[in-house]
Amino acid sequence: MNPEHSPLGKATVYAAQYDASLLFPIPRAGAREQLGITSALPFFGTDIWNAYELSWLNARGKPQVAIATFYVPAESPNIVESKSFKLYLGSFAQSKFDSVDAVRDVLKRDVSAACGASVSVQLVSPHDFAKLEMDELDGLSLDRLDLDTDVYEPDPSLLSAADGENEAPVEETLVSDLLRSNCPVTGQPDWGSVQIHYVGPQIDHAGLLRYIISFRNHTGFHEQCVERIFLDILHACKPVKLAVYARYTRRGGLDINPFRTNYNQPMPDNARTARQ
């Protein structure tokens, strides 16, 4: 299914009852082919979706609320278009479920079917809300650099690294809050923070910041932007190990946080940043 056929940018009709058919899958293959990925993926990882506007009725008709987190594997053939996800979650509001577990099971079944892979689902009930953490991405801030730039479309030529043959490899974690891209259907801006961890030739910090800023006028879904960043750094700077994690601010009650890596490491924390 193409994004142009999704609910984005169209008049919205809110479902009165639970409706799994509202989920609109978008194949990852098209965007990945544009990046030169036609066979085995050069990374693995997860898309972490947090849903803050989930409510349903219990068996006696009393409203219940929860925060839902979905872990979508990067190898899934599809992503779910975000507005369709919002409408799908909204369809739970006037539907009765016997338990929290029943809601979780339905969410897992439906979203897994739309993505074409097993999706993990966690629900946090109100009595656990106080346990949820808020934190910023850890690392050395690239935003400390005072520099000029005038490139606002992705340009991997901005990236460079030290000569790997003549200098020892380094291990660094770098972060920036200056990531912005735009929805390919509506043109609405998507604001994010990005964390880049690598082992290899030292990456030029100023060039990396200019590269991140260069996404400012780019149109692409969150997941596609992170994969482009990962591949451009991998090809231009040739790190031995690389991980890219972005946390985007929420829209429509959802935030999307893609993570891509080429080496085994723990799942990143799902702590909200201040802007989220």
Swiss-Prot record:
Protein name per its UniProtKB record: NADPH-dependent 7-cyano-7-deazaguanine reductase
GO terms under biological process: queuosine biosynthetic process; tRNA modification
Binding residues for NADPH: S82, K83, R251, G252
PANTHER family linked to this entry: NADPH-DEPENDENT 7-CYANO-7-DEAZAGUANINE REDUCTASE (PTHR34354:SF1)
Keyword Lyase set for record: no
Compartments it resides in: Cytoplasm
Single GO MF descriptor: preQ1 synthase activity
Any one GO CC term of the record: cytoplasm
Function: Catalyzes the NADPH-dependent reduction of 7-cyano-7-deazaguanine (preQ0) to 7-aminomethyl-7-deazaguanine (preQ1).
Residues that, per the record, bind substrate: V80, E81, S82, H222, E223
InterPro entries: GTP-CH-I_C/QueF (IPR043133), NADPH_dep_7-cyano-7-deazaG_red (IPR050084), QueF (IPR029500), QueF_N (IPR029139), QueF_type2 (IPR016428)
Keywords attached to this entry: Cytoplasm, NADP, Oxidoreductase, Queuosine biosynthesis
Catalytic reaction list: 7-aminomethyl-7-carbaguanine + 2 NADP(+) = 7-cyano-7-deazaguanine + 2 NADPH + 3 H(+)
Entry's family note: Belongs to the GTP cyclohydrolase I family. QueF type 2 subfamily.
Keyword NADP part of the UniProt annotation: yes
Assigned EC number: 1.7.1.13
